[in-house]
From Swiss-Prot:
Its EC number is 2.1.3.-. This is Carboxy-S-adenosyl-L-methionine synthase. Gene3D superfamilies: Vaccinia Virus protein VP39. Keywords: S-adenosyl-L-methionine, Transferase. It holds the Pfam family Methyltransf_25. It comes from Shewanella sp. (strain ANA-3). One of its GO terms (molecular function) is S-adenosyl-L-methionine binding. One of its GO terms (biological process) is tRNA wobble uridine modification. It catalyses: prephenate + S-adenosyl-L-methionine = carboxy-S-adenosyl-L-methionine + 3-phenylpyruvate + H2O.
Amino acid sequence: MNASQDTIYAQASEHISDFQFDNRVAGVFSDMIRRSVPGYTQIINTIGDFADRFVKPNTQVYDLGCSLGAATLSIRRQIQGRDCRIIAVDNSESMVTRCQENLNAYVSDTEVELICGDIRDIHIENASLVVLNFTLQFLPPEDREALIAKIYHGLNPGGLLVLSEKIRFDDAPIQSVLEELHLDFKRANGYSELEISQKRSALENVMKPDTLTLHQQRLTRQGFSHFSLWFQCFNFSSMVAIK
């Protein structure tokens, strides 16, 4: 996955459009997410480790919101020879096109079905692992519960959901300090104040983070009885829930 440098918001613009996973973003996404999301590489690698432990032979794996395929590739490396199928879904044609190129670059005996479509329309069945890696936060809040319910019903007993999300905090001082530390992380990775400000404006209407408590309550309501936060750096997190 050769990454071009993200300079999308480097020039001042009078009108900042809502963030979209279009061709411009797809072309720099690997660089963008590495410089914007603390711990992203660790999360991707650990998703593969979870797959090694939870994916059962002759079952299916779902990567919902697969972007360029980083999680799918991490999973596929760990489940060779299990006669499984990975269903990777993204609603951005640009992302799916580049994802297919990334998948084609590696030989594997594990089938990947790559779908350009809405994750809310995907039928989930016989699943031993479902991954939502920084995806749920982009759905309208009113649609999130139904998706979690669909995932729960499509998972086999003992199956795992990995849910990575930017989170918000009801505690104002905690929200403030962790948000500022995240901005420092982006500054340290070469983003200017202009880039940070303009991207924040672009994301304002399309990404709505939940609190960790809300995530856990939603998962519990839909039937998940085992839950843990396994990763957090500033306001970025990854959780697991077992059916």
